[in-house]
Amino acid sequence: MGRGTTLEDPSLDLCNGVYLSEKERVERRQVAATKEGSTFAFLSSEVVRYSSVAAAMAAQKELLKVLAQCQSEKGYKDPTGALVPYEFKTLSNIPAGVVSESNRVFVYTNIDSGTRARTLLGFYQFNGDMFTGLYVMNTEGFSDAQVAKWLKVAATMASRLKG
């Protein structure tokens, strides 16, 4: 991925939020995969090291705050003032192996409508000064089996995050 090892691109960008913690990142590796003809609009994993445990905790708090606002407002307003709608779904059957609930933010949401409609699975996991993210966006939504498959991938990423 172009610039996948730089700090130029944001790590946290859910719901177009403001994440001041981005300036506390000291290392980053993001990898994206694409396949022509695939319904996956975006598939990426990322690992970030923050300047401190406190900085990583601040990032998680910012993410939770933006998520709560996006859920309550059912989306966010773009620069023109138009609402970009989000319809959040509940993730069930969280597998063993992911980080504890207090150290993760898992998102399952439909974004926008019409030709811009897409579904996001975002798995944000924190451990100490490290963060790992798995982002899967599909233009055709996800079956329960697909969600379960990506949750297993999140568990694998969590095991690597733990060292």
What role is predicted for each listed range?
Residues Q69-K74, F131-L134, A158-R160:
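Glycine-rich loops and low-complexity Gly/Arg-rich segments
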Residues R118-N127, M137, V147:
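Mobile, glycine-rich extracellular loop/lid and propeptide segments
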Residues M1-T119, V153:
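A small/polar (G/S/T-enriched), proline-flanked helix-loop surface module common
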Residues V99, Y124-F131:
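Short, solvent-exposed coil/turn segments at beta-strand boundaries
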Residues V53-A55, T132, F142:
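Residue-level signal for secondary-structure boundary sites
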Residues L43-E46, D129-T139:
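Short, well-ordered beta-strand elements
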Residues Y135-G163:
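Surface-exposed amphipathic alpha-helical segments
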